[in-house]
């Protein structure tokens, strides 16, 4: 993927790594060059923060001011209370209390992990302190030392299509629904695939789009969206939903399939769970 990025950028002699998670994460995990790890992580964490024409600080301040104004127009003190009003937590105070309850045990666990990672770092670089760009690299070393497990060795078992088919099979076993790939459907990008979802009797559950690969202009991360919501109209007709799962997994290259990390597998199943929520909705 890094070679293809370089070719696309007009540098066929090079390898191009970018501040995208799918690009720089393997570098942070496996690159022995500490300075390169630092450079990539800093490039990622300081995006939009260089006091130039692409700087976002003023935009963020303005965005937050507008969110506060919007919340107050609706009678709420802050944006968090406004957003949470129809959620289980109800308000920011409840969320803060929950976060406080997990803070101490989480901090203890993080310090315990950092201590183990520092030991490994000290073996390689005596006198150096653990830094953010060391964390993933030495986590991989610790995993190999403790469990003789290299995440890269797991990836061939998690080819993207196999993982997605596994998710479909699980949904079939749990809910009795089937997934049929549809060819020739209108899509906004050639990489997008479309599936018709039906019950055992052939009745329509909904339509699922999947858009799994990064590309220029696409937002990072993974999410589910409703393209068309499920609803029952005034005549009692149930309109079935159109749902999309979006990800940014490693794109297959010439002769090489898209192989997922364990974290990627969890992400795919997580977003597929949201898709099932949307597909199986029978709200009025």
Where are these regions (language model features)?
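Short, intrinsically disordered, charge-balanced linker/junction segments flanking boundaries
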Residues: 1, 283-284
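Active-site-proximal, well-structured secondary-structure segments within enzyme catalytic domains
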Residues: 1-18, 29, 61, 66, ...
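A ubiquitous short alpha-helical element
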Residues: 23-29, 49-55
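Short, charge-rich amphipathic alpha-helices with coiled-coil/heptad character
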Residues: 30-47
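Alpha-helix N-cap/helix-initiation motif
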Residues: 52, 56, 156, 160, ...
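Active-site recognition of the HExxH zinc-binding catalytic motif
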Residues: 68-75, 171, 251, 256-281
């Amino acid at each position: 993927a890094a070679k293809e990025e370089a070719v696309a950028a007009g540098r066929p002699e090079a390898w191009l790594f970018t501040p995208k998670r799918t690009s720089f994460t393997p570098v942070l995990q496996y690159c022995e060059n500490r300075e390169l790890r630092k450079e990539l992580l800093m490039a990622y964490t300081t995006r939009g923060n260089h006091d130039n024409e692409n700087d976002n600080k003023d935009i963020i301040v303005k965005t937050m001011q507008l969110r506060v104004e919007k919340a107050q127009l609706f009678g709420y003190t802050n944006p968090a209370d406004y957003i949470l009003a129809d959620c289980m937590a109800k308000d920011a105070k409840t969320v803060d209390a929950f976060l406080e309850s997990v803070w101490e045990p989480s901090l203890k666990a993080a310090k315990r992990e950092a201590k183990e990672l520092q030991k490994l770092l000290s073996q390689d670089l005596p006198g150096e302190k653990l830094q953010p760009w060391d964390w993933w690299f030495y986590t991989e070393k610790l995993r190999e030392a403790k469990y003789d497990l290299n995440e890269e060795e797991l990836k061939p078992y998690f080819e993207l299509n196999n993982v997605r088919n596994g998710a479909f099979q699980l949904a079939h076993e749990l809910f009795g629904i089937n997934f049929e790939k549809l060819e020739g459907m209108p899509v906004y990008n050639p990489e997008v695939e479309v599936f018709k979802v039906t019950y055992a009797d052939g009745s329509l559950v909904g339509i699922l789009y999947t858009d799994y690969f990064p590309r220029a202009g696409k937002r990072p991360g993974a999410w589910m969206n409703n393209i068309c919501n499920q609803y029952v109209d005034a005549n009692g007709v149930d309109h079935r939903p159109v749902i999309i799962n979006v990800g940014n997994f490693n794109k297959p290259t010439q002769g090489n399939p898209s192989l997922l990390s364990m974290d990627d597998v969890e992400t795919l199943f997580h977003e597929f769970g949201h898709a099932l929520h949307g597909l199986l909705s029978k709200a009025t």
